[in-house]
Amino acid sequence: MRTSQYLLSTLKETPADAEVISHQLMLRAGMIRKLASGLYTWLPTGLRVLKKVENIVREEMNNAGAIEVSMPVVQPADLWQESGRWEQYGPELLRFVDRGERPFVLGPTHEEVITDLVRNELSSYKQLPLNFFQIQTKFRDEVRPRFGVMRSREFLMKDAYSFHTSQESLQETYDAMYAAYSRIFSRMGLDFRAVQADTGSIGGNASHEFQVLAQSGEDDIVFSDVSDYAANIELAEAIAPQTPRAAATQEMTLVDTPNAKTIAELVEQFNLPIEKTVKTLLVKAAKDSKSPLVALLVRGDHELNEVKAEKLPHVASPLTFATEEEIRAVINAGPGSLGPVNMSIPVIIDRTVAAMSDFAAGANIDGKHYFGINWDRDVATPVVADIRNVVAGDPSPDGQGTLLIKRGIEVGHIFQLGTKYSEALKASVQGEDGRNQILTMGCYGIGVTRVVAAAIEQNFDERGIVWPDAIAPFQVAILPMNMHKSFRVQELAEKLYSELRAQGIEVLMDDRKERPGVMFADMELIGIPHTIVIGDRNLDNDDIEYKYRRSGEKSLIKTGDIVDYLVKAIKG
């Protein structure tokens, strides 16, 4: 490709509304342009990267035995009503009616459509297992689209759905998809972790997220510094302290704390170690509970894990924190003065809190706290559960090493759905025993557009994008200096351009009448891995300057050797 016949569209300045580096660089490198909130046009450079990501995904899905299909973006509402998600999904589901007043949705996902297809096409266990995939546009009416294509309303996604007659068969496909995803992200040169995850609104049993590690990530990823253990912070188990609870050394005393309504204020005003404090959070109780509220206690320096808490049988789902009015109606004290002593509602304490002694907590009287509280002496030990977020330095749940926490961008997610959708839509086949059998499902997604942004978040420097070779828009940039004034520069540039293309190498030759500084800046901004610079001065010695984008290293290579050198560097 020649720049004179190409839409380069690079920008010198960073657009003011671009918050994260991937959004900034995708705009500056001429990869995307915003059409409306959460909607982007992909320009040629961006589309080349997107297609490379898509091709890697397609190759590995085919290698794993999945079958490609294509389903409509527009879906009839009756399928969503049948599955029960018409009301559950909320405002992110874009609903509309056609000219016949029939309701439809723009598909944010395709569980209903594929299940409808399978229930009409399959009749016998002999046809299973099958795993269908597509690479298709999705639309989710995000309330706050942000970060460019990282969280856009319209996006490209690879979604796959497998169908089985047994859990064992589902597990085999799930493991195959796990391995395929690992190959996909490894081939793209990404630093990622496959982490245990909560199944969320999709439902089902087992679930893993594939997270690209990046500072701009929205998720906290927990992993061991020694083993392969990795989990989303919502799911990571906080191991109970291994040391026995220390013996009491203080008497419980009631202390006036009128200006200490938070743990931070209590610690500062009374010079308490924060790890000797306990915070009490009140949430709505489950419907069958005798009490309207439940008290959840975590150590002062720990955070409540809302996903873990919501799964407790005593707690209402979705997790709902009590208002001050609701708290005072039951406890007769405000949120800043709550604690376990004389608490009139059920109490659940974190494992770490159960191991504490001589600690401070609210007295359930406004403006007062108890100091020196000890379990079983001052208050009976309540129900104990893992209800906190892990912190860096906690022991790994698998017993190997300690935990590290980094930010991650979710680029893939695999689920064992079980029978959630097949039961709702009555998708069944005749089983081996001749009886009707509801199908067991798995689903497997990759955010193709998000992968592009995530790759940039891991691969950039002060000059622009530094693409991994496998997904770079071009493999080689040819920069002929003053080619319109130097015949030998032009002749050699054209010769190398033809020879490299004949070797199957993707080349962008900058044949614009631009200053060298502009040409260098654009190629580095775009992030092409290999650059060769052809100039009269080096040609006097039969040399060409070669530069590798990632390391920045430069070297002089003889003109007769440069093609072989590049072919070897790119193809190995």
From Swiss-Prot:
The keyword Electron transport does not apply. InterPro entries: aa-tRNA-synt_IIb (IPR002314), aa-tRNA-synth_II (IPR006195), aa-tRNA-synth_II/BPL/LPL (IPR045864), Anticodon-bd (IPR004154), Anticodon-bd_dom_sf (IPR036621), Pro-tRNA-ligase_IIa (IPR002316), Pro-tRNA-synth_IIa_bac-type (IPR004500), Pro-tRNA-Synthase_IIa_type1 (IPR023717). Its main location: cytoplasm. CDD domains: ProRS-INS, ProRS_anticodon_short, ProRS_core_prok. It catalyses: tRNA(Pro) + L-proline + ATP = L-prolyl-tRNA(Pro) + AMP + diphosphate. Disulfide bonds: none annotated. GO terms for cellular component: cytosol. Keywords: Aminoacyl-tRNA synthetase, ATP-binding, Cytoplasm, Ligase, Nucleotide-binding, Protein biosynthesis. Its EC number is 6.1.1.15. NCBIfam families: PRK09194.1, proS_fam_II. Homodimer. Consists of three domains: the N-terminal catalytic domain, the editing domain and the C-terminal anticodon-binding domain. This is Proline--tRNA ligase. It comes from Salmonella schwarzengrund (strain CVM19633).
